[in-house]
Amino acid sequence: MGMSTLTSKLESLLNRGKGTEQRLARFLLDSRDNFVAMNVAELAQAAGVSSASVIRFTRQMGYRGYSDFKVDYLSDEKQYKAESLSGSLNPYDDTEQIIAKSGQMFITAIEKSLELLDPNTMDEIAQKIVEAKRIVLFGVGTSAIVAYDIFYKLIRVNKYALFSPDLHVQLSYSSNVDADDLVIAITAKGNTPDINHMLKLANKKGCSTIVLTRFGQDEAVRLADLVLPYFYDEQLFQTGVITPQVLQMVVFDTLFFKYLTLTNEDVVLALQKEREAIIQLG
């Protein structure tokens, strides 16, 4: 019996059922959490019917007995909760609902972002990071947070990287890159004028360019050699529920894992040296 069939039948009994059927259906729909640990006698008492009525009810619903009914009910309950989380947050949600809905929204946004990643492109970008003399990072406003996170990850594994939150310093970088460098630009929507200007400067220098931005055909995407896309939902970002920076970090971390597989021995040595330096601080 399908999961949605059971709930549909219970809801139908509220309208056309009689006496015992209605009482059991109402309890099962309104008291989902309470039912989980109940045996036949406990359900009968809670719903105000006899134990025999419960057994008869389950058989009328198409089950061999109470145990089979309960297994299907709990499966149906799992789907019900998942569907109830699909809606957006609203001012009337209690704390438990806020936690659950937020978690579901983060999971969905992350999964959708990872689905946008092309393995061949990831391989190519990871190899470019390995081969680059320097990694030059561009990011302004809140995108600078992501750029700094990337910068810190790279220098920890002894990869030469440049970043400054100062726009004028970034402009200086973009004017002085060469063909041996690799630019990684971070922009939420791909239409930040300063970022696009610096990408144009880097392109004129013959420097390879990567852009980490929302999926689509914005100007930054057209200017870059390769793109790391992430899932962008205007409604979620405008309300501040999920920020682009979270998803951008997840996408880069995924790329970074690939990079680490290409430089494993060097990474281990670099991290060991870092730990030793920290220990020496006492």
Swiss-Prot record:
Disulfide bonds: none
A molecular-function term among this protein's GO annotations: DNA-binding transcription factor activity
Superkingdom field: Bacteria
Record InterPro entries: Homeodomain-like_sf, HTH_RpiR, RpiR-like, RpiR-like_SIS, SIS_dom, SIS_dom_sf, WH-like_DNA-bd_sf
GO biological processes: carbohydrate derivative metabolic process
Protein name per UniProt: Uncharacterized HTH-type transcriptional regulator in aarA 3'region
Residue ranges flagged as DNA-binding region: 40-59
Keywords recorded for this protein, A-Z: DNA-binding, Transcription, Transcription regulation
Database matches in SUPFAM superfamilies: Homeodomain-like, SIS domain
CDD domains linked to this entry: SIS_RpiR
UniProt domain HTH rpiR-type: residue ranges: 4-80
Residue span(s) of domain SIS: 125-265
Database matches in Pfam families: HTH_6, SIS
Keyword tRNA-binding: no
Keyword NADP: no
